[in-house]
Amino acid sequence: MTLSILIWLPLAISLLAALMPQPWIGRFAAVGSLVTLGVAISFVARFKLGHAGLQFVTDDVWISALGIHYKLGLDGLNVVLVLLTTVLFSASLWWSSFREWERPRSFYFHFGLAESAVLGAFCAQDLALFVAFFDLMLIPFYFLVGMWGSGERVRATTKLVIYTLVGSFFMLAGAVATGVLTSNETGGSLTFVLSSLQQVHLSHSSQDWIFLCFAVAFLVKMPLAPFHGWLADGYKSMPIPAVAVFSGVVSKVAAYGFLRIVLPLFPYASVHFQMPMLVLCLISIWWGTLVAFTTTDARMVVAYSSVAQLSFITLGIFSLKPAGGQGALLNMVNHGLVTAPLFFLVAAAAVRAGGSEDLRDMGGIAFRAPLLATLALIVALATLAMPGSSNFIGEFMILLGTFQAKTAVSVIAFLGVIGAAVYALRLFITAFHNRVGRSVASREVGLTEAVAIVPIVLVILVLAVYPQFGLKRSEPTLRATIAPAQSQAAAGRAAKLAAGRPVRVVASR
């Protein structure tokens, strides 16, 4: 079984679902998502631990004239993210299958296309192929927002497209420049295969401006402040299943891109821009935290909490330390497992508050739906990184890596952890406790909500007990990924010592 089967299976299932009678389309797509999940589990089960290189490699020439390969592979950076993708898409499709959608064939087709694009981006081992899948992700979400969104969906779609296309333009320019400059440097033929590009060290000035091109694209997609101008309208207008997978896994493709592409290909630039990136992360952490704490819109609390959490993840990546990088990878998974059920819970609470997502219309749900409130409490505690949760381990590792790199930055970031506890508890207490809301109906958790939320909550609990599931698989590859940047940083410190300038030395593990 090859990775191509895993990548294109969701799209194939969505096309088969379109042939079904209309009442069966959603259930067929949902059951099909379990097949994709099973295939992903089979790859994870066969994944060899302690191996830093690629596994399950597919490598075929795609466009020979441009040196573009259809190269796929799994390693410690992407194997758990692939599994996360299939879990969250499956949960979202089951949530969707219990609802009526206009033009259901088109709706489930775009969901299948989105899952295939995300899986392709995670598995791509050719820079041009990664860019193709990265841009392909925009198409289904353009239609999911524009055709099935709510509120100001036209405005939301326009902003999403403009921001994403600008980011994609920068990424395309950076990718082309990387391939061309690498070819000029070696005097060989043009290639975009990542393993080949990593063998060549571009000039410092070239690395700097190409780094900025990729950084803009990834920071817009995640997004981090101040690149988040599309987020409020986009997240507010997306249908709940779409926003759950967008925040849960699509945003992770951008964070993953920093690890897969930026750090190994541009080590000098990664060190050169380390401090600006860390400062940007701090600004974004506090911006997301403050907005999440002050807004009365439950969906926006989750949206801006995602900005803060993704900023923590980026902080760990640019600590350029193994602990920070592993914490970032672990929290990519943790955040996906937390944010998707949070959006489902917001939708469930809104149904019980007369369709309103305003926190002022909620309250008292815990007294009438204690099981639903229990699920919400587990997710909220995971969000605030309660000791004992997998999120706590991830954030601890991020802060440890940041402390090893820049102590002052880690102290300021730690205060952001306290802010996360404040907005997570505020969301839970206001929506599920306090007074009884104006329109709260007496309804316990239903099958529609249970099939999407309960399995993810169980995974959260399993990872809390056994976080090594992800850590053991990622460690060898992660260390190899950040090694070029660490070597560059060490060379910079040596140069400063040779010049007689003081250098702050921090122990690294």
Predicted regions mapped to residue ranges:
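Transmembrane helix-loop-helix hairpins at membrane boundaries of multipass inner-membrane proteins
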Residues: 2, 17-109, 184-199, 480, ...
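Central hydrophobic cores of alpha-helical transmembrane segments in multi-pass inner-membrane proteins
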Residues: 2-19, 30-45, 82-96, 114-116, ...
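Alpha-helical transmembrane segments of multipass membrane proteins
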Residues: 14-19, 41, 90-94, 116-120, ...
